[in-house]
């Protein structure tokens, strides 16, 4: 049972661990994106991969189902930490942890919804961004009981999902602790800026994409790959 700030931190670490699952960023979901986009080839005749290659996925496709479940599980753990009555009441006793945990939870939630809207929503475009139910359901409060878990949440528009992602990342950038105070593997300001640059790129807002990418590049803390073409040869295994 969650009673203390330490309990909430363990739950937050569970949300980070959820990112590593195969249905989120742990492996086969990302490979599935490559197969759907024809950047990769399904060279095995298994049901899931053949469906994805042919763009005929249905509800029983294990890769799609795991993507949905694992990502929403991580989002819900983040919501339980910082965006639930219980989490908020516990964090009220420690304002420093409150700001940090809310920023980290916002980052995880943004990453999750960016993953989901690209997998299950329409691409962001002026002609489709405001069509009802073409995004994914937005759950912004932690689900703490079975009754709430089974409530039907309608899909939001693509525009609404992207607006939430951007709002969460802006909050994370403003409130994440400095990099020297962050344990390895946890969200950083530069990580949030890099993700926000990618979000704006997918939104076709190239000015803001360049703005946040340049902020990360200009820190001079990271090396840039000088030969991207080398990463896409058939023999490339990285």
Regions found by a protein language model. Name each.
Residues 119-159, 163:
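Short coil/linker segments at helix-helix boundaries
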Residues 48-121, 156, 173-179:
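Conserved, well-structured interaction surfaces
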Residues 1-34:
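Acidic, glycine-rich segments characteristic of secretory precursors and extracytoplasmic regions
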Residues 5-8, 12, 160, 204, ...:
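Extended ligand-binding clefts on enzyme/binding-domain cores
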Residues 106, 193-200, 212:
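TPR/Sel1-like alpha-solenoid repeat signature
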Residues 75-78, 162, 169, 213, ...:
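Inward-facing hydrophobic residues that define packing positions of alpha-helical scaffold repeats
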């Amino acid at each position: 049972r969650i009673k203390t700030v330490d309990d909430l931190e363990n739950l937050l670490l569970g949300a980070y661990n959820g990112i590593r699952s195969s249905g989120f960023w742990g492996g086969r979901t990302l490979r599935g994106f490559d197969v759907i986009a024809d950047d990769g080839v399904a060279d095995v005749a298994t049901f899931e991969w053949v469906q994805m290659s042919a763009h005929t996925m249905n509800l029983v496709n294990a890769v799609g189902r795991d993507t949905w479940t694992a990502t929403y599980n991580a989002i819900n753990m983040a919501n339980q930490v910082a965006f639930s009555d219980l989490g908020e009441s516990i964090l009220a006793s420690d304002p420093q942890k409150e700001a940090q945990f809310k920023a980290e939870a916002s980052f995880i939630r943004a990453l999750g919804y960016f993953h989901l809207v690209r997998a299950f929503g329409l691409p962001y475009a002026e002609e489709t961004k405001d069509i009802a139910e073409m995004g994914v359901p937005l759950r912004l409060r932690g689900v703490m009981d079975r009754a709430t878990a089974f409530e039907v949440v309608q899909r939001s528009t693509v525009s609404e999902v992207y607006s939430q992602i951007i709002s969460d990342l802006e909050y994370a950038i403003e409130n994440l602790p400095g990099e020297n105070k962050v344990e390895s593997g946890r969200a950083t300001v530069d990580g949030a800026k890099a993700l926000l640059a990618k979000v704006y790129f997918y939104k076709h807002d190239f000015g803001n994409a360049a703005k946040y990418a340049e902020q990360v590049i200009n820190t001079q803390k990271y090396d840039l790959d000088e030969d991207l073409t080398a990463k896409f040869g058939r023999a490339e295994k990285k």
